[in-house]
Curated annotation (Swiss-Prot):
<dbReference type="InterPro" id="IPR039101">
    <property type="entry name" value="TMX2"/>
</dbReference>
<dbReference type="GO" id="GO:0044233">
    <property type="term" value="C:mitochondria-associated endoplasmic reticulum membrane contact site"/>
</dbReference>
<feature type="transmembrane region" description="Helical">
    <location>
        <begin position="103"/>
        <end position="125"/>
    </location>
</feature>
<keyword id="KW-0597">Phosphoprotein</keyword>
<feature type="domain" description="Thioredoxin">
    <location>
        <begin position="114"/>
        <end position="269"/>
    </location>
</feature>
<keyword id="KW-1133">Transmembrane helix</keyword>
<feature type="region of interest" description="Disordered">
    <location>
        <begin position="269"/>
        <end position="296"/>
    </location>
</feature>
<feature type="topological domain" description="Cytoplasmic">
    <location>
        <begin position="126"/>
        <end position="296"/>
    </location>
</feature>
<protein>
    <recommendedName>
        <fullName>Thioredoxin-related transmembrane protein 2</fullName>
    </recommendedName>
</protein>
<dbReference type="GO" id="GO:0031966">
    <property type="term" value="C:mitochondrial membrane"/>
</dbReference>
<dbReference type="InterPro" id="IPR037463">
    <property type="entry name" value="TMX2_thioredoxin_dom"/>
</dbReference>
<comment type="function">
    <text>Endoplasmic reticulum and mitochondria-associated protein that probably functions as a regulator of cellular redox state and thereby regulates protein post-translational modification, protein folding and mitochondrial activity. Indirectly regulates neuronal proliferation, migration, and organization in the developing brain.</text>
</comment>
<dbReference type="GO" id="GO:0007420">
    <property type="term" value="P:brain development"/>
</dbReference>
<comment type="subunit">
    <text>Monomer. Homodimer; disulfide-linked. Occurs in both reduced and oxidized monomeric form. Oxidative conditions increase homodimerization. Interacts with CANX. Interacts with ATP2A2.</text>
</comment>
<keyword id="KW-1015">Disulfide bond</keyword>
<keyword id="KW-0496">Mitochondrion</keyword>
<feature type="modified residue" description="Phosphoserine">
    <location>
        <position position="288"/>
    </location>
</feature>
Length: 296
């Protein structure tokens, strides 16, 4: 399954891959990930490179390089077991490939290793992964509008994502959250986002840490009646996030989106004449990642 999951996701996303290759971030990242392969296998780049092969062929891998590449493959397969989107699969491949490339280049020549590390640093400083720009029904808040919107109509249920553009998990979750907003957004159930990397006082007010060590980004909070009802991931006593997978199925089940959606549709049909009701918190049920999504 560790091998089949990324392959199936890759096949279903072939049209998207063609658009990725046209973007500088993915193109340059792919070149950096395959740098050692190109240098070692393509003449005349491989001519004159040191090698430990018995036949002295500088344009082929020696046994130690093969071991490193096999270890890289095993690490990528283990990490991709928990990946949900194609972006996460590709990101893991790029990240661990660059680490393996750095090790392999340092084995050849320390100068080549330093050059490769320098190129990676320049790449990280100049190229940022493209943000999700697809369709969505999401309202973006700032440090002032979030409280006003939550208090404006307490009959409306809000699901708000606290995110930061620099967090890879937030970028991977963006298309999933957008798809959920397209399916479930209605008059009584709204979706919102706030950039806590930009509005730090919001992160303090809603107790969402932006430190990479706490792994609290992204955080989803359900508001009913203007008050927080539940959040994912949960936080332990040390202030760290309890491990939770941000898949579409998990969000639907943990937040009871099907039930909230049906209740919100009744609210929209009844109009504005009904009195405000006390919010009812959904009953969170933790389920495995492999279960299928309920039919709405």
């Amino acid at each position: 399954m560790a091998v089949l999951a990324p392959l199936i996701a890759l096949v279903y996303s072939v049209p998207r891959l063609s658009r990725w290759l046209a973007q500088p971030y993915y193109l340059l990242s792919a070149l950096l990930s395959a740098a050692f392969l190109l240098v070692r296998k393509l003449p005349p780049l491989c001519h004159g490179l040191p090698t430990q092969r018995e036949d002295g062929n500088p344009c082929d891998f020696d046994w130690r390089e093969v071991e490193i590449l096999m270890f890289l493959s095993a690490i990528v397969m283990m990490k991709n077991r928990r990946s949900i989107t194609v972006e996460q699969h590709i990101g893991n491949i790029f990240m661990f490939s660059k680490v393996a490339n750095a090790i392999l280049f340092f084995r050849l020549d320390i100068r080549m290793g330093l050059l490769y590390i320098t190129l990676c640093i320049v790449f990280l400083m100049t190229c940022k992964p493209p943000l999700y720009m697809g369709p969505e029904y999401i309202k973006y808040f700032n440090d002032k509008t979030i409280d006003e919107e939550l208090e404006r109509d307490k009959r409306v249920t809000w699901i708000v994502e606290f995110f930061a553009n620099w967090a890879n998990d937030c970028q991977s979750f963006a298309p999933i959250y957008a798809d959920l907003s397209l399916k479930y957004n209605c008059t009584g159930l709204n979706f919102g986002k706030v950039d806590v990397g930009r509005y730090t006082d919001v992160s303090t007010r809603y107790k969402v840490s932006t430190s990479p060590l706490t792994k609290q980004l992204p955080t989803l909070i359900l508001f009913q009646g203007g008050k927080e009802v539940m959040r994912r991931p949960q936080i332990d006593k040390k202030g760290r996030a309890v491990s939770w997978t941000f898949s579409e199925e998990n969000v639907i089940r943990e937040f009871n989106l099907n039930e909230l959606y049906q209740r919100a549709k009744k609210l929209s049909k009844a109009g504005d004449n009904i009195p405000e009701e006390q919010p009812v918190a959904p009953t969170p049920t933790r389920v495995s990642d492999g279960e299928s999504k309920k039919d709405k």
